[in-house]
Design a protein with these regions (language model features):
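Eukaryotic N-terminal low-complexity, Ser/Thr- and Lys/Arg-rich leader segments
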Residues: 1-4, 308
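Eukaryote-specific detector of the first structured module of a protein
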Residues: 3, 7-83
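Alpha-helical solenoid repeats of the armadillo/HEAT superfamily
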Residues: 19-33, 61-77, 87, 99-118, ...
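The feature encodes a structural signal of leucine-rich repeats
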Residues: 42, 55, 81-85, 95, ...
């Protein structure tokens, strides 16, 4: 059976070099279905040197070629990440698909493929070094016309990029902070605020972020999210707590003093709510933030005495 599959895959891959666009399209359609429905075929497709040929199709103006190519690469990334990363031109092709997608589906699949590759820690600095990829992901988030699914996959990819600390400054430079806070303020679609604030919390862990946070009115946004009156989910509140705590840990007393000067009772109440009712990780971070901010509240004192 394996021999038969290999032969079938080899024949399909050979068709990707055809001068006929119809032949290439038909082969890509079959490879997409095969890689989606048959997990065993994925390594066979990758080993047949199909990846560079599939990636070339991302430069085609034809919607059907771009869609089938990005979907196939996404399927292959499930189990053949090393093949994708070692294949010439794949990251550049994905970058092109992010910035010049023939359809929203292409942008979504390209972002999802990047996110899949970022699950391997060793790939994060490599992908983070590709400025065009980060720029493309940020533009998807920035563009109010982007489909919700595309934005979600772009946010997940940006989160993966930000997990490598040395990538964060470049994200700030390429406008990620402004795009993320703008999304939080203007877009109420379920799940997007949670994902956006998760990225903000990661980006907050670099020295370059604080001044940009202030220029983007991000501090006010984070404090509004902590206000119980806004009805933010606990995940959003915990991300806001992490953002402030990470900023203080990186920026030291100067940032801590800045945050203290902006602190209001409503915000302290929100942090206390996380300390009392959040996840274990959220509770720990909320208590750490309250301690750094030198909060004076009987509930905080009760929580700290209980935790000690």
């Amino acid at each position: 059976m394996d021999v038969v599959k290999r032969r079938a895959v080899k024949n399909l891959v050979a068709k990707l070099t055809s001068v006929s666009e119809q032949t290439r399209t038909e082969a890509l359609c079959e490879l997409r279905l095969l890689s989606k429905n048959d997990a065993e075929s994925r390594p066979l497709i990758a080993e047949a040197d199909a990846v560079p040929l599939i990636a070339e199709s991302l430069y085609s103006p034809a919607v059907i070629l771009q869609e089938n190519a990005t979907a196939t690469l996404l399927n292959l990334s499930i189990s053949s990440k090393e093949h994708l990363m070692s294949s010439h031109g794949v990251l550049d092709a994905l970058s092109h698909a992010l910035r010049h997608p023939a359809s929203p589906f292409v942008a979504q699949c390209a972002a999802a493929t990047i996110f899949s590759l970022l699950s391997l820690e060793s790939f994060r600095p490599i992908i983070g070094h590709k400025r065009d990829i980060i720029f493309g992901l940020v533009e998807i988030v920035r563009n109010q016309g982007s489909a919700a699914r595309s934005i979600k996959d772009a946010l997940r990819a940006l989160f993966g990029v930000a997990l490598y600390p040395l990538n964060r400054a470049q994200m700030v430079e390429l406008g990620a902070v402004q795009a993320l806070f703008s999304l939080v303020v203007k877009d109420g679609r379920v799940g997007l605020i949670e994902d956006a604030t998760a990225v903000i919390a990661q980006v907050a862990g670099c020295e370059e972020s604080w001044e940009v946070f202030k220029k983007a009115l991000g501090i006010e946004v984070l404090m509004d999210l902590l206000d119980n009156a806004t009805g933010s989910s606990y995940r959003v509140k915990e991300n806001a707590v992490s953002s402030l705590l990470n900023s203080i840990q990186v920026g030291g007393e100067e940032v801590a003093s800045d945050v203290r000067g902006r602190m209001e009772a409503r915000v302290v109440d929100g942090i206390l709510d996380v300390a009392e009712n959040g996840s274990e990780k959220g509770k720990s971070k909320a208590l750490a933030l309250l301690k750094v901010l030198e909060a004076q509240d009987s509930r905080f004192e009760a929580l700290t005495s209980h935790s000690s």
